[in-house]
Design a protein with these regions (language model features):
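S-adenosylmethionine
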Residues: 1-335
Length: 335
């Protein structure tokens, strides 16, 4: 928080978050503080897998089991379960065991919606495990996208393959590779880069171990990785293609500063303001965007998804809250 602030600091706040507060207005720091406190009561959320079911079927099955839920107006496949419902309850459902639903936070559902991959497009998920966003891209494109999913960790690649199979996602090219070293032979219409980060947006008040995880050493490591991943992504992105960069961080070093620096290095790339999509047409070919993407832009505008001021105009910083983890999204287009 700013010097001279009288706001009580968040108890046992990791140093990285405290440093971020120092660069913010008191109002924004207080909103984030409140979000971290409310996160302790964050409800379980899940996504209906459109490759295997419909939102209405999921609603019907949840009702039959007496599980309270709320639908999300900006994404028909998203469900917020009632107070007291735990993940264990979902694990026991046939819906879950059959791959008809996937446990996924609301914030992590945002990147595939913002990317808005076209049906039949060549899509790269650069850091794909455990597969939630990969499978969501497949569902949003009706299984027509040609998806390449990168994961350099063998155990995580196995988990990715298992989840995609369970969710009915077929034909994905899983590459056991470091996405920072992808050959320039490859090229993609759309790229999702949900980059490794400090995870500061996921902090919850009372997490005493976060101080040991969220360190300056980790930030230095993730920032180097993010830079390399962004450079490689913008290299293998086709002209006219789009890259969605995201993190679950509230730190400018991982968000706006990374994106601004990448745009300086890649002069043929520019930001596509996410709220512009509310008009319902893509800026390159005037074809209507999916209704879910238009609804997402509207939710950013009307406050249904709480946001903070972003340093790079047109990008979105989701404020931590009871329902949302702190998250950052930037949509970049290559000329």
């Amino acid at each position: 928080m700013n010097a001279g602030s009288t706001t009580t600091p968040l108890p046992r706040t990791p140093e990285l978050i405290a440093q971020a507060y120092a660069a913010m207005s008191d109002q924004e720091a207080e909103r984030i503080q409140a979000g971290f406190a409310a996160a302790a009561a964050r409800p379980v959320t899940l996504r209906a897998n459109a490759l295997k079911t419909t939102p209405d079927e999921v609603a019907e099955k949840l009702t039959e089991r007496g599980i309270p839920f709320e639908r999300v107006p900006w994404y028909e496949d998203a469900f917020v379960l009632g107070d007291g419902v735990r993940e264990k309850t979902v694990w026991e459902l046939e819906l879950y065991q059959e791959g008809k639903v996937y446990l996924q936070s609301l914030s992590s559902m945002l990147p595939p919606l913002a990317l808005a991959a076209r049906d039949g497009a060549d899509v790269l998920d650069m850091c794909a495990a455990p597969g939630g966003k990969t499978s969501q891209i497949a569902a949003l494109t009706g299984g027509t996208a040609h998806i390449t999913a990168c994961e350099m960790s063998a155990p995580r690649a196995e988990k990715l393959a298992y989840n995609l199979s369970k969710l009915g996602v077929h034909g994905v090219n899983i590459m056991r590779a470091d996405a920072r070293r992808l050959d320039e032979f490859f090229s993609f219409d759309h790229i999702l880069l949900d980059a490794p980060c400090t995870g500061t947006g996921t902090f919850r008040l009372g997490d005493d171990r976060a101080e040991n995880r969220m360190t300056g050493k980790l930030l230095a490591k993730t920032a180097r990785s993010q830079r390399a991943l962004l450079d490689r992504a913008l290299t293998v992105l086709k002209p006219g293609g789009t890259l969605l960069y995201s993190t679950c961080s509230i730190l400018p070093e991982e968000n706006g500063e990374q994106v601004a620096a990448a745009l300086r290095r890649h002069r043929d790339c520019s930001i596509v303001p996410l709220a512009v999509q509310q008009a319902g047409v893509a800026d390159d070919d005037a074809k209507p965007l999916p209704a879910s993407t238009r609804a997402l832009a509207g939710a950013f505008e009307d406050g249904s998804i709480p946001t903070l001021k972003s340093a790079v105009e047109g990008t979105v910083t989701v404020c931590p809250s009871q329902r949302f983890e702190g998250f950052y999204l930037a949509l970049i287009k290559k000329q």
